[in-house]
Amino acid sequence: AREYKEALEEMNIEVDIFRVSDEVAKTLPQYYLINSKEYKDEFESINVIKSGKEILDYDAIFMGSPTYYGNVSGPMKMFMDSFSDIWVGAPLSGKIFGCFATAGSQHGGGELALQAMNIFAQHMGMTLLSVPCSVRGGYPAYGILHIAGDNSDIRPNDDAKIGIRDYLKRLNI
């Protein structure tokens, strides 16, 4: 999310970052949390979003999720389900949508998590910003996928950061 924010701001696009509440993350075994301690304060300082109604005025929406058992996290799924009361009115129709995910391994279900977020966006009537094959890094068309390692100890490298910037250059806002 930080890389997206920095890249979009370099393009003079105003950016707000939100996170969903994730009580599950607080219960993870310590060996998962060791590698993320340095990011804990930064993460917790991000405003929690509770409902889809909070993002109706944005021109573009980028969602990101860790991969839990081959899908988006439970809290992300609950957030997507919070749009059910606004779905019929289609207030997000035509807005740009992109997504990103992390997974422990290449075959850890990251593409399925990306597809779940894309399907959600399609049901909302949003316009998908696919990842073309020309974007550096060999990402799936569904969104940017970062392989974080079994213990989430692999951070995005320079190639990933360049890939994100290449992808976001396709925005027309």
Q: Which ranges hold each PLM region?
A:
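N-terminal beta1-alpha1-beta2 submodule of the flavodoxin-like/Rossmannoid cofactor-binding fold
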Residues: 1-89, 137-140, 147-173
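Short, glycine-/small-residue-rich phosphate/pyrophosphate-handling segment
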Residues: 93-139
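A general structural signal for short secondary-structure boundary/capping elements
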Residues: 107-112, 145-147, 167
